[in-house]
Amino acid sequence: MEHYDWNDGWTFTPVFDPAIVRPECPDLPLTPVRIPHTVRTLPYNYCNENDYQRLCGYRREFFAPKEWQGRTVLLTFEAVAHDATVFCNGRRVFHHGCGYTAFTVDLTESLRLGEQNVVAVRCDSREDLNIPPFGGQIDFLTYGGIYRAVSLDVKEPAYLRDIFIEAQAEGDFRIYTSTVGETVGCTLQAEIRSPAGSRALYSGELSLPIVGTLNGVHPWSIGHPFLYTLTVRLIRPGTSGLPDRVLDEKSTRFGFRTLQFVAGGLYLNGQRVELRGLNRHQSYPYQGYAMPDSIQQLDAQILKKQLGCNAVRTSHYPQSQAFLDACDELGLLVFVEMPGWQHIGDESWQAQALQNCREMVCQCRNHPSVFLWGVRVNGSPDDEAFYKRTNEAVRRLDPTRPTGGAHIRRKDQLLEDVYAYNDYSYTGRGAGCENRSAVTPDLRRGYLISEFGGQQFPAKTFDDEPHRLAQALHHAAVLNDAIAQPGVAGSFGWCMADYNTHREFGSGDRICYHGVLDSFRNPKLSAAVYASQKTPRSPSDIVLEVSSSMALGDHPGGFAGACWVFTNAESVRLYRSNDFIAEFSPDRRGRFAALPHPPIEVQDFVGSLLEKYEGLDPVVAPQVAAILNEMRRDALSLSPLSRARLLSLRLSWNDLLRMYYKYIGVLGSPSSVYRFEAVWHGRTVRTVVREPVQSVRLECTVYNPLLTDGPTWDCAAVSLRAIDQNGNFLPYCGEAVQLSVEGPVRILGPSVVPLRGGMAGTYLATTGRAGRAVLHCKMEGALDTEAVLTVRKRS
């Protein structure tokens, strides 16, 4: 058994020429490339989807040693977008019609042993293909290229094709295998290795599953994602005194856990889980889909650790094994979905969609994080015959998980186990989501909200403060009402990050600004809604995000309006120029009472200042303060009750205006300094200070500064933010940042990037060498900054 990473040594042509498949290739203009690769890099916005739609070609030459005689040589592509035909030495050996699942090509019969050989790939990324997700409009770009890893395996003629383990929380398991080649007389050996390293061996026959019980297992859960490793060996017993021979072995990680999805919700190991997740596209600025494993894994870490999600939906296609591996490790539940968007094609299209479902399940079913199969094309109409087939195919391959699928209409035909509904009913008023009984045709089955938010309230990082706040409160309202409604298993916001899209969608610049993060994964205010729902276990877990910059000019008429604090602290203290104003706690009876940590509306900006500085009576001062806070909230308007109270207090309108502008409006008064303190376990653990900007600094954060070149090129994600002297980001800073690098990395995308909403990003890719790398960042009006990276080389 030999394994080779095959991600270097490729050449590429943007225009396919049949000559590229021949061993003796004429002098074609081929460009050396490394995998993952995109057929065309695109600008950040105002891109053209036609640019990546092309028929192109890849070619790789290699030497096949004579020692491979009598062996099986298998070439695996983790994904090629979207229609791939593979040639070996000029001979067509395989065709694959899905851009989101892996496929394996048997090269054995086409090789010339002891000679140079050629593998070529005809890659078609045009969107007129009669395969999913194509055929109708699509609200995301589909890109193109060999964008996931490639590998070569040399095996015996008989080998293991697949292994699958069903493992329950109590320790019971069943192991299924499939083989290729002559296996008469062969046996199986299964080894289960625990997280602590202990091993248990089990023997079995090829014709039957291996059944057993492992005592004392640690179940996989969201909070404790214990992973075990299964290794299955195909053994040919020895004869004439010779030892047994291991023909092949295959390993996979898995978890012992039990799933139930019923009318009351999702139960994991007997405990109900309130799903709180986001939808994720696997695309990135400039590169589209073509990013290495570390960047895929980073998204999972952002979802779980930064945003506090416990679930993610792979909209609208299966995503990389690296992403699912990270979800397994982190305890992030995954709703995996078949490729497609609203359209159902003809019989040929449906046959490919059915094959996509089979590949999706076979390639993802050992991941304990996967809890639901999406077997309907997102948002598509009913098609009883087609969806009976998708459900049957998936249930046959994996009877342990429920099926679902995203509906956009009420009372659709329900052939799945779970009615998943894209609920865009909330417009800022009324209920945050529809009543379950008005949507699902069968209240006895599971129900979840597969999308919300998104198109109903997009927000850009450079939108004004009221708009950014409104998006955050929109997400909070739907999250709250989904939790509050019995029978709703949870919800998935649309979506994790902004993404490029087709001309029919988005804001006219080919971007849908639907994310709680921007395209570079920088957080918007709405990200704090999710992050603040985490249960804190240490001071570092405390979130404190204040919606307002306290700059009155960002609001019509100079009236600051609402100020919300998104936090998971026990309370928040407010100070004005070192004077204590008030301490605020979450309202457990208010609009967001169902959330684990409701956002806090700051409604008092006066506190006891009137007693201290105006000498008002302790009985009178709170009444006047209430009127001043009302004026702040309602743009100097007073209710009839407040006007009557003003008369009873013997205060003139001019007296009131003077105090308003002194303590709230600051007109003619020195600018105030506001300090917000998060209180947890009785002490201040996080502080936010709002005051006029005195200095601007460029903050450069590298999320993965230790890179490993091999088995593919690696990449560092870089976040750039303009911040003030207190670390507050500056949403209206639009300066350009000039980037340059030293050492064994290169910049993906432009070397000069503008800050959008005070934020930007870039990516640094390895170049095949090891060493120290430095990123230099320059911005007018700020000190230069740099970040240091280390690149290791792995063969």
Place the predicted regions along the sequence by residue.
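Beta-strand-rich binding/interaction modules
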Residues: 88, 172-204, 561-583, 674-678, ...
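Accessory carbohydrate-binding/adhesion or oligomerization-edge regions at the termini
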Residues: 1-43, 122, 472-479, 521, ...
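Extended acidic/polar, glycine-enriched regions
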Residues: 112-116, 178-260
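Substrate-binding/catalytic cleft of secreted carbohydrate-active enzymes
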Residues: 174, 302, 311-528, 533, ...
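Accessory beta-strand-rich segments of carbohydrate-active enzymes
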Residues: 3-16, 38, 49, 53-160, ...
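Carbohydrate-binding surfaces of carbohydrate-active enzymes
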Residues: 483-706, 723-725, 733-734
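Active-site-adjacent substrate/metal-binding segments within catalytic domains
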Residues: 37-64, 68-76, 81-88, 94-97, ...
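Beta-strand-rich structural segments
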Residues: 175-178, 232-234, 563-567, 714-731, ...
